[in-house]
């Protein structure tokens, strides 16, 4: 969620390839800017040609689309609501997102040209963090845990059938957020709170059973994202004090630091070819202030 307004959003290329035990002190590579506004939560399309992202317009978080080179921007939403957590359908024909207005948060879908917006999740739920199943028939999402004490209580993970609107509870008990299904549809990665001072990346079977802790670290960690081939998971965590982006194997082994950033780096997203990770980096701890959209090429990583 991004509730503030910032003035500058940039893409920064970082050439990194380091293990957690040998993190560099300065990012490598030359930084350059493509956009100059509030731009966060960028998600590349399945074909890698377009990027959906969020920009603040007159105090509202609106959805935008641009080409992967930063050109050809179009505004998708223009209503008096906030729009968060965009996610492409596997065929690139729909974009899901959170539509927040008048105290409600529902999962909605829209065409990439900005037409055909439809709310699909129940208004009785405060829905967040939608992601599509590989077959494009369902959307996973969670309920609002508010992320701020003492409001942490229950956040369940659901699947909704896009055609029938039927909702199935997959994971319950505690605070479970950021669900995303593996490319082969066999597993769900998600973030689970462990008390008030720790969160971990978990993985469960596709029906929500057999949850197991992958990160097992005393830090706050979450925001999981599967690599296109399903062999690795990117995530964000503050195990090095500041929130940074890491990559691990799908079994939780071989954790590597992707980008040595300052501030709060979260919401990693893989490029369709698996060679880059996009993420949002906020220079302040609270979301939405001085946030940059960044991309880290992984050519030199030990895969």
Language-model region placement:
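Positively charged n-region of N-terminal signal peptides that target proteins for export
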Residues: 1-7
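Bacterial N-terminal signal peptides
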Residues: 7-17
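Sequence signature of WD/YWTD-type beta-propeller architectures
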Residues: 21-303
């Amino acid at each position: 969620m991004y509730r503030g307004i910032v003035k500058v959003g940039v893409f920064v290329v970082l050439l990194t390839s380091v293990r957690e035990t040998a993190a560099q002190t300065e990012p490598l590579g030359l930084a350059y800017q493509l956009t100059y506004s509030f731009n966060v939560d960028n998600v590349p399309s399945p074909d890698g040609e377009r990027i959906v992202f969020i920009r603040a317009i007159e105090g509202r978080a609106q959805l935008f689309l641009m080409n992967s080179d930063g050109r050809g921007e179009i505004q998708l939403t223009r209503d008096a609501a906030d729009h968060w957590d965009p996610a492409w359908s596997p065929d690139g024909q729909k974009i899901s997102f959170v539509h927040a207005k008048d105290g409600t948060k529902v999962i909605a879908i829209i065409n990439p040209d900005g037409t055909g917006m439809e709310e699909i999740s129940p208004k009785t739920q405060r829905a967040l963090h939608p992601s599509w199943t590989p077959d494009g028939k369902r959307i996973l999402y969670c309920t609002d845990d508010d992320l701020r004490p003492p409001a942490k209580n229950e956040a369940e993970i659901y699947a909704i059938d896009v055609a029938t609107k039927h909702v199935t509870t997959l994971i319950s008990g505690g605070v479970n957020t950021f669900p995303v299904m593996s490319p082969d549809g066999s597993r769900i990665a998600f973030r689970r709170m462990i008390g008030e001072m720790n969160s971990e990346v978990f993985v469960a079977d596709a029906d929500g059973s057999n949850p197991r802790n992958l990160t097992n670290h005393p830090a706050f960690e979450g925001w999981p994202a599967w690599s296109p081939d399903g062999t690795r998971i990117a995530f964000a965590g503050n195990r090095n004090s500041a929130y940074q982006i890491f990559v691990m194997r799908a079994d939780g082994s071989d954790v590597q630091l992707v980008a040595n950033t300052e501030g709060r780096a979260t919401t990693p997203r893989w490029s369709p070819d698996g060679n880059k990770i996009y993420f949002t980096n906020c220079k302040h701890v609270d979301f939405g202030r001085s946030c940059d959209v960044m991309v880290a090429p992984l050519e030199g990583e030990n895969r």
